[in-house]
């Protein structure tokens, strides 16, 4: 090198002073090469083609390249056989606090002309394509699972500009975005219809408003398209099966969510339940009275006393009521008795409109059951109720009243009052009717139910002169039961012997809310009695 008299170009980084790229020996694998070895022998680091260029003879002294050997060998993992693409990232140092405002970014890699450290930019904007090409196709997820977001692209074009008549612009948006500062001016804020070539409306600086108050937010004037004086009609013949089903379902859906529908369902359930209850009861009575000497009656002096007949009738009435109440109490409450319905209204368990519907259903159910027994069984129709064994009218009224009071009060305590045994209330109700029939069948026929006595009289066409006691007696018994029920409620019977069979929701010793409700009712009655609370008002 020193023996030659030629001038060598000055060595600067990876290029010569003339701008020629240094040729390095080719290698397909990355290798750990000391940087010191790379730059220590510039005479072997590159070779010039003598046919194309030869150093001229000159008297300039030979300049040796600067000694760039580091103090400690530094190894690099880069492939030195090919030039690095883009700028090579250098280790960042914490910038001065005045530049980063106290936040240190460990990814600082660039420096501006002023010497200020710049933050690193993500590879999303500056993609190293050489690095991508060097990667195997199997290691790139974008080749195995192509997705539109993997491809670099510029701003998507406004496709509607490729359509004829795009100058009219889209329909105006729902909201006015012209006042938003985060929207760039290059965003298309065309609202409404504008002429071809006209400037967008946001450029004028005026706030876009609706053309009229009749125009809706979606740009459609519903008022101008309304039919004057006529109602909108739908041609069912021009609808698809799905549209036809939807149109026909609208009135049905509205009706299904109404109280009228609920009353209708309860009425139907009460009619069917009363019919089934009295049908089995009448059929059993018909069987028990086959050998009776008195026609069209279940009791009478000529009938005589037969313990088997009395027991059979009591059992069939009690079990028929128990089974059918258990079936229908979820639908209508399973009352099957106008006297019980009246009692439920007086204690506030059911509203008056529901009670009226149930009353007519019970009367019709008694008539239907009587007609079924009359038409199905070949024996003489013998299920009517009359006084017997020298029973007076007054005695008959009070016998019916007391027996009915016992039945109605049983229903209040087992069904109306909620407790652990509420779900087996039909058993207790059926047993209550059973013991009442055991007492009353011989003397009054054991009616306890105006519908039970009214139905057979209608079917047979014969009304006895004492038929009225089967209305007055049960109604009187209902008032007796209601009075006693309200009396013990006023005395707070729940607090007298708590914890017997009350559940966690209704026992005041277990539920503090229930206890507060009882105390609030006590205070309300006290204030009402002292005149501080007007009758009919509620305690807030």
UniProtKB/Swiss-Prot annotation:
CDD domains per the UniProt record, alphabetical: MIP
SUPFAM superfamilies (UniProt xref): Aquaporin-like
Catalysed reaction equations from the record: H2O(in) = H2O(out)
Molecular function per GO: water channel activity
Biased composition range(s): Basic and acidic residues: 119-133, 140-155, 174-194, 204-214, 502-530
UniProt induction comment: Expression is higher in vegetative hyphae than in conidia and infection structures.
Keywords, comma-separated and alphabetical: Glycoprotein, Membrane, Repeat, Transmembrane, Transmembrane helix, Transport
Protein's recorded name: Aquaporin-5
Native species: Botryotinia fuckeliana (strain B05.10) (Noble rot fungus)
Organism lineage: Eukaryota, Fungi, Dikarya, Ascomycota, Pezizomycotina
């Amino acid at each position: 090198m020193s023996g030659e008299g030629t001038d060598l170009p000055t060595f600067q980084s990876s290029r010569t002073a003339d701008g020629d790229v240094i040729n390095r020996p080719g290698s397909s694998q990355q290798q750990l090469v000391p940087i010191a070895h790379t730059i220590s022998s510039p005479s072997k680091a590159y070779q010039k083609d003598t046919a194309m260029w030869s150093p001229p003879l000159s008297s300039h002294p030979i300049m040796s390249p600067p000694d760039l050997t580091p103090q400690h060998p530094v190894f690099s993992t880069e492939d030195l056989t090919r030039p690095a693409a883009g700028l090579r990232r250098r280790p960042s140092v914490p910038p001065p606090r005045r530049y980063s405002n106290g936040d240190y970014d460990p990814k600082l890699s660039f420096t501006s002309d002023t010497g200020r450290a710049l933050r690193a930019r993500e590879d999303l904007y500056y993609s190293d394509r050489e690095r991508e090409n060097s990667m195997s196709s199997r290691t790139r997820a974008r080749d195995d699972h192509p997705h539109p977001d993997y491809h670099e692209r510029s701003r998507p074009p406004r496709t509607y500009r490729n359509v004829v008549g795009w100058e009219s612009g889209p329909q105006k948006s729902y909201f006015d975005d012209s006042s938003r500062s985060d929207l760039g001016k290059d965003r298309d804020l065309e609202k409404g219809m504008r002429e071809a070539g006209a400037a967008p409306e946001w450029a004028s600086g005026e706030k876009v408003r609706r053309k009229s108050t009749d125009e809706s937010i979606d740009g459609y004037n519903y008022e101008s398209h309304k039919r004057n004086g006529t109602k909108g009609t739908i041609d069912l013949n021009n609808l698809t099966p799905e549209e036809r089903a939807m149109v026909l379902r609208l009135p049905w859906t509205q009706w299904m969510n109404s109280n009228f529908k609920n009353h209708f369902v309860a009425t139907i359930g009460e009619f069917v339940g009363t019919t089934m209850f009295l049908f089995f009861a009448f059929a059993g009575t018909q069987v028990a009275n086959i050998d009776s000497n008195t026609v069209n009656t279940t009791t009478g002096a000529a009938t005589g006393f037969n313990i088997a007949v009395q027991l059979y009738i009591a059992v069939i009435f009690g079990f028929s009521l128990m089974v059918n109440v258990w079936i229908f109490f979820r639908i209508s409450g399973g009352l099957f008795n106008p006297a019980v319905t009246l009692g439920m209204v007086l204690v506030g368990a059911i509203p008056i409109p529901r009670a009226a519907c149930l009353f007519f259903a019970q009367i019709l159910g008694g008539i239907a059951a009587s007609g079924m027994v009359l038409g199905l069984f070949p024996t003489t129709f013998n299920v009517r109720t009359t006084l017997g064994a020298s029973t007076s009218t007054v005695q008959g009224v009070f016998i019916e009243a007391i027996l009915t009071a016992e039945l109605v009060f049983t229903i209040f305590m087992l069904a109306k009052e909620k407790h652990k045994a509420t779900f087996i209330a039909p058993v207790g109700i059926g047993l209550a009717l059973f013991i009442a029939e055991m007492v009353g069948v011989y003397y009054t026929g054991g009616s306890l139910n105006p519908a039970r006595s009214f139905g057979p009289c209608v079917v047979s066409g014969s009304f006895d002169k004492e038929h009225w006691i089967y209305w007055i007696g049960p109604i009187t018994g209902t008032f007796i039961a209601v009075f006693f029920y309200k009396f013990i409620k006023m005395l707070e019977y729940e607090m007298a012997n708590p914890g017997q069979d009350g559940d966690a929701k209704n026992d005041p010793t277990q539920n503090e809310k229930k206890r507060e409700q009882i105390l609030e009712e006590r205070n309300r009655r006290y204030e009402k009695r002292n005149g501080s609370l007007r009758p009919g008002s509620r305690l807030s």
